[in-house]
Regions:
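Short alpha-helix immediately C-terminal to the canonical SAM-binding loop
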Residues: 75-76, 146
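Conserved SAM-binding loop of SAM-dependent methyltransferases across substrates and taxa
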Residues: 50-62
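Conserved SAM-binding motif I beta-strand of class I
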Residues: 64-69
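S-adenosyl-L-methionine
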Residues: 1-44, 55, 76-103
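Conserved glycine-centered beta->alpha loop in an early N-terminal alpha/beta scaffold
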Residues: 47
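S-adenosylmethionine
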Residues: 94-187
């Protein structure tokens, strides 16, 4: 996963931060080694960016993977990243998540945290619950938000089965970033849809 190239021109308005390889590996390990939610499954990666989670799911034996992002440039890089590690079976889709339809065994996502556009993470979580039987969704860690996310999940017919606390270390991505790497505390939610 270290070889997956980051976005060459990330857009601040879309909160495009390439998920660090270590964090992606941890999420994928939890999803497959602990819960068995990737191998032989259909997987959607919402807001896939340059494809790190999608590619990881395919490498771990997902039967069918769809990576979705609104940014055509990110999808082009994702497709090249997949090819560079010998993965050709991923369907890369340029789309707003609101237009997506279908059913997947598992949805994995590192959505925008809603820093630039309030509620962006909520839209991703609602769509993931609509599409997936099991959802892995990464959110900025905030004790006050945990109750809100749990209620939102339940309102949309899901249940939080596990909460994993993690740290991500983000390299400087935009001009206003001054730290060599920034630690971000995040929560990974495992959600089961009741639909």
């Amino acid at each position: 996963l270290e070889g997956v190239r980051p976005h060459p021109n990330p857009k601040e308005a879309l909160e495009q931060y390439t998920i660090p390889a270590r964090a992606a590996a941890e999420i994928l390990f939890i999803a497959q080694a602990i819960h068995g939610d990737l191998e032989g499954k259909s997987v959607a990666d919402l807001g896939c960016g340059t494809g790190r989670l999608s590619i990881g799911a395919a490498l771990l034996g997902a039967e069918f993977v769809v990576g979705v992002d609104i940014d055509p440039e990110a999808i082009a890089v994702a497709a090249r990243n997949g090819e560079s590690v010998g993965i050709r079976g991923i369907q890369w889709v340029v789309s707003d998540i609101s237009a997506l339809r279908g059913e997947f065994d598992t949805v994995i996502q590192n959505p925008p945290f809603g820093v630039r556009r309030r509620g962006a993470d909520r839209e991703f979580l609602e769509k993931a619950i609509e599409l997936g039987r099991v959802i892995y969704s990464l959110h900025k860690s905030d004790p006050d938000s945990r109750g809100f996310i749990k209620r939102l999940v339940e309102k949309h017919g899901g249940a939080v089965t596990h909460l994993y606390q993690m740290d991500m270390y983000i390299p400087p991505t935009f001009d206003f970033h001054v730290e060599r790497r920034h630690r971000v505390a995040v929560d990974l939610y495992r959600v089961v849809s009741r639909a």
